[in-house]
Amino acid sequence: MKLLGDTFGQRIRFVGLQGSFGRGEATEKSDIDMVVILDAVTAEDVRSYNDMLNLLPNREQMCGFFSGKNELRSWEASDLFQFYYDTTPIYGSLDELLTVLDDAAVRRAVKIGACNIYHGCVHNMLFDKSEEILKGLYKAASFVVQAIAFRETGKYIRLQKDLLEVTSGDERKITETFLGLKSGGEVQFDEMSELLMNWAQYWIQNT
């Protein structure tokens, strides 16, 4: 925070953490997903933020989101669902985003997520045939399951392992598969790809 304050001063509107650090699940290899929102952002601000990040000893782990407040307010609402609920505030608040996070936004998050996963899965089955891509698609699917669970329960389940308590059917299978892959489980490419493709296909047609 001190470096941020020295760089941007009172222009800072929000600072938070996303990802494994935000959820308290970080390991030594985890990326540090910082969210920094300023009053406004110019290309010069991006360069200044880059210079600030270069001063950090763990620069290679730094990633995240850097934006002006007006851009965030006008962002695609379906993207803001995961953004809001997966961000742990350090300074400031994102609560004003709640005004756009209605059921339509969450429904759209499910639909867009399923479409992207379906395309990525079929493309990977045909062309890339990559286990790493499949793992990434299951990670993306776990976020869609969070949105599905939110629509069904009204609660955001932040930790994927806790989704097992509120999901059933294919949502539970998707979550179990993701957690298994995350812990180093063996990739069964054809079987896992088919499960993911069929699951995404269902939500494209039923959302």
Regions found by a protein language model. Give the residues of each.
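N-terminal loops that bind phosphate or other acidic moieties
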Residues: 33
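Short, glycine- and small/hydrophobic-rich beta-strand elements in well-ordered beta-sheets
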Residues: 10-18
